[in-house]
Regions:
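N-terminal signal-anchor module of multipass membrane proteins
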Residues: 1-49
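C-terminal transmembrane helix-loop-helix hairpin of multi-pass membrane proteins
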Residues: 1-11, 23, 170-191
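Hydrophobic alpha-helical transmembrane segments and adjacent interfacial helices
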Residues: 21-32, 55, 73-87, 104-109, ...
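Structural signature of hydrophobic alpha-helical transmembrane segments
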Residues: 27-47, 86-102, 144-160
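Glycine/small-residue-rich interface belts in oligomeric ring/scaffold proteins
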Residues: 43-85
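C-terminal ends of transmembrane helices
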Residues: 48-62, 103-118, 163-178
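Cytoplasmic-side transmembrane-helix entry/capping segments in multi-pass membrane proteins
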Residues: 62-73, 92-95, 116-128, 177-188
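Functional transmembrane core segments of multi-pass inner-membrane proteins
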Residues: 140-187
């Protein structure tokens, strides 16, 4: 198998996107006040849609429409479960994740095509459902008095780490971890 070429501009674009995404989430968290949670939930829902799109395109599950539809519905339900209750808790998010997985299983059972790869599709559904529910936990965290500050620190650290890793890949894409991976070990370690 020939080595995959290093795409430096793609690494720079991913670094810029991760930085902008981190800034968007940080500034979105500022919109959440003591009684105002919906604006931040809308920002998080936008990020969840990007997450669903990126992962369904990367994983390419056999039942892509079912997986994507379940994930988008779970994202909306998770945001509602995070923003609407009077007391901030993670319990409702767990129920939403479990219900989303059950709906994903039922969606797979009614399909006749591609049942041979049902475990791949269920694995992708579980991965994406847990991911969108994890993003909704930011809304729950913003409802706790010190949670907003904690989320700012975590989001800033994540955005900086991703940007540094990808910018390092653009400048120093070596030593290669494997010929099929267009990233260098320096970027993985620096990030």
């Amino acid at each position: 198998m020939p080595p995959v070429p290093v795409r430096r501009l793609l690494s720079v674009a991913v670094a810029g996107f991760s930085g902008l995404l981190g800034l968007g989430l940080i500034f979105g968290a500022y919109t959440a006040g003591p009684g105002v949670r919906v604006p931040f939930a809308v920002v998080v829902f936008g990020v969840q849609l990007l997450f669903v799109f990126a992962w369904t395109m990367a994983v390419r599950p056999p039942a892509l429409p079912v997986v994507a539809a379940v994930a988008v519905v779970v994202a909306g339900a998770a945001d509602a479960a995070a923003a609407l209750p009077r007391i901030a808790a993670l319990g409702p998010l767990g129920y939403v994740a479990a219900a989303g997985f059950v709906v994903g299983v039922l969606g797979q059972l009614v399909r006749r095509k591609d049942r041979a790869r049902v475990t791949d599709s269920l694995g992708a559904t579980l991965l994406i459902v847990v991911g969108v529910v994890a993003f909704a936990s930011l809304v729950v965290l913003s409802r706790i008095p010190i949670g907003t500050q904690a989320s700012h620190v975590c989001l800033a650290a994540t955005a900086v780490a991703l940007a540094v890793a990808r910018l390092t890949d653009a400048v120093l894409p070596w030593p290669r971890m494997a010929p099929q991976v267009p990233r260098g070990a320096a970027g993985v370690v620096a990030g």
